[in-house]
Amino acid sequence: LIFGISAAMAFVQRAFLTMEPIIISRAGGSEALGAIALSIYLGAQSVGMVTGGLLADRMDRRTLLVRLCFLALPAHLAAIWLGPTGVLGITATACAGFLGLATLPPIVVMAQELMPSSTAVSSGIVMGLAWATGSLGVLGTGALADRVGPFAAALLSMPVILVALGLALHPELGRPARPATGA
């Protein structure tokens, strides 16, 4: 479950980072505007990461994940729809970045709780392996963009957040790990 949430969110973030500059360029925007959009998104991600960590230490992590995933979908859709022009578009881009990476601290801690004797391995699985898996999906977004254009492909990719949300709502998520029974 945790792996799936991490992979889905990684896909969404990488699809945004890949498509947004292309969308801006195709709409007649400058490369500088594309760079500004990515800088806003990535800068907000760093704030989201720290905030997500603070919140994960202070509240139920499953509830936090559900809320972050729930809010991340409209934020990403608005960021793509509005683009980084105007206050509303810049705010949407920042919110999308913030919410997207704020999911990572609770994901990592929950993975570590599932494998308390292998915390480094669990972190590597939900970061490295899940991120690589999610990144592979961007190939599909690119192929879709060749058919329907980057704007539509980006918008159609964002509902993958619903997969993360569904997994975060799964009743097994957040239950304490059962101790291994040895012989």
Go through the PLM ranges and name each one.
Residues 88-102:
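Hydrophobic core of transmembrane alpha-helices in multi-pass small-molecule transporters
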Residues 49-60, 145-146:
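Helix-to-loop junctions at the C-terminal end of transmembrane segments
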Residues 102-115:
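Intracellular juxtamembrane helix-capping segments at the cytosolic ends
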Residues 1-49:
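Extracytoplasmic gate region of multi-pass secondary transporters
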